[in-house]
Amino acid sequence: MKNKFLICDECQAVNLKSLKRKLEKLDPEAEIEIGCQSYCGPGRRKTFAFVNNRPLAALTEEELMEKVTKQLKKPRDPEEEERLRKRNEERKRRKEEQDRKLKEKLKKRKAEK
């Protein structure tokens, strides 16, 4: 089973360019998905990545890469990964819904002016 990394291109603490390079070097065969991961709170203060649907965060990229390496050495449980995948998808769906409602509200206020 291929490893999967999810990294954010919007969070302040994530340096997308260097993190992506390090993850590719660690596992060239892994699938890397770039985009908002709806993990904004921790993403303001810590660099993070989802490794096989499990969130990992650290204050520095070096610390994060140590955690990623440890996580990749652990045995994988397909049922647990599926549960985590569903949880992540639900979190993303809720964030998109909140964003949509906020845009509608702002659009409505603008129209009232």
Curated annotation (Swiss-Prot):
Extent of Basic and acidic residues compositional bias: 68-102
Give the top-rank taxon of the lineage listed in the UniProt record for this protein: Bacteria
Task: Indicate whether Ribonucleoprotein appears among the record's keywords.
Answer: no
Supply the alphabetized keyword list.
Coiled coil
Q: Where is this region: Disordered?
A: 68-113
An example Pfam family from this entry, by short name, is DUF1450
Q: Please list the coiled coil stretches.
A: 78-113
Basic residues: bias regions? 103-113
Keyword Ubl conjugation in annotation:
no
Q: Which family does it belong to?
A: Belongs to the UPF0741 family.
Q: Which HAMAP family match?
A: UPF0741
Task: Please identify the protein, giving its name as recorded.
Answer: UPF0741 protein SE_0364
